[in-house]
């Protein structure tokens, strides 16, 4: 009986917001870092390899008083950026949840770095409409969790669109790629210098040999 009840509960969750029948609940959009990801049920590896996942047990991402939805995604996958640049968000920035033909706007009001087992910041707060974006940190190490929380505000399309500007700073991921490119260029230049120097030494040695003969 318990197993049957659990199966029914799982089935009920999987069908929640599954309007198109493809498992997609909605879309999370973060204008500042130019990210728009589908949100699927759960946070399995299969989901997080391709999209954002809704943390089962948290509120459904449909807004409303006394709700707190949690949306999770990976950072720095070779195949997709996902939440790689989530660390670029600051207090006052906005992100959007597109669900059921509605656009819900959230303003960032809290940014935390916590241990994986610390979920206290994900609790529902009475009367509040909250969404937390969750990912691993530091980049490439992933020993902690970055939580970017927002509270519901009226959606002002132009104000949010204005946040789509070049990033004021480079993320760890972007910095890493930049240093890789710089390293390759420097190595290439160094090899070229050695090659030219070797050629000059060979020519000099050849001339000396000719003069001796």
Label for each model-derived stretch:
Residues 1-176, 201-207:
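Solvent-exposed, non-transmembrane regions of membrane-associated and secreted proteins
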Residues 176-182:
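Short, hydrophobic alpha-helical membrane anchors of single-pass surface/secreted proteins
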Residues 185-199:
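Alpha-helical transmembrane segments
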Residues 210-213:
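Solvent-exposed, low-complexity, intrinsically disordered
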């Amino acid at each position: 009986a318990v197993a049957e009840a659990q199966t029914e509960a799982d089935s009920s969750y999987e069908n929640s917001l599954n309007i198109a029948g493809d498992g997609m609940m909605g879309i999370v959009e973060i204008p500042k870092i130019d990210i728009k990801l589908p949100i699927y049920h759960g946070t399995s590896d299969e989901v997080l390899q391709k999209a954002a996942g809704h943390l089962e047990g948290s509120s459904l991402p449909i807004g409303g008083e006394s709700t707190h939805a949690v949306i999770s995604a990976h950072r720095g996958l070779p195949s997709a950026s996902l939440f790689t640049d989530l660390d670029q968000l600051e207090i006052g920035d906005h992100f959007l949840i597109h669900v059921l033909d509605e656009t819900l706007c959230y303003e960032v009001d809290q940014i935390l770095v916590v241990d994986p087992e610390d979920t206290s910041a994900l609790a529902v707060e009475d009367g509040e409409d909250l969404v937390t974006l969750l990912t691993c940190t530091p980049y490439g190490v992933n020993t902690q969790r970055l939580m970017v929380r927002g509270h519901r505000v009226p959606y002002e399309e132009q104000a949010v669109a204005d946040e789509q500007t070049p990033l004021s700073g480079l993320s760890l991921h972007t910095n890493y790629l930049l240093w890789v490119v710089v390293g390759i260029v420097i190595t290439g230049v160094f090899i070229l210098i050695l090659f030219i120097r070797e050629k000059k030494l060979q020519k000099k040695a050849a001339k000396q040999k000719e003069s001796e003969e």
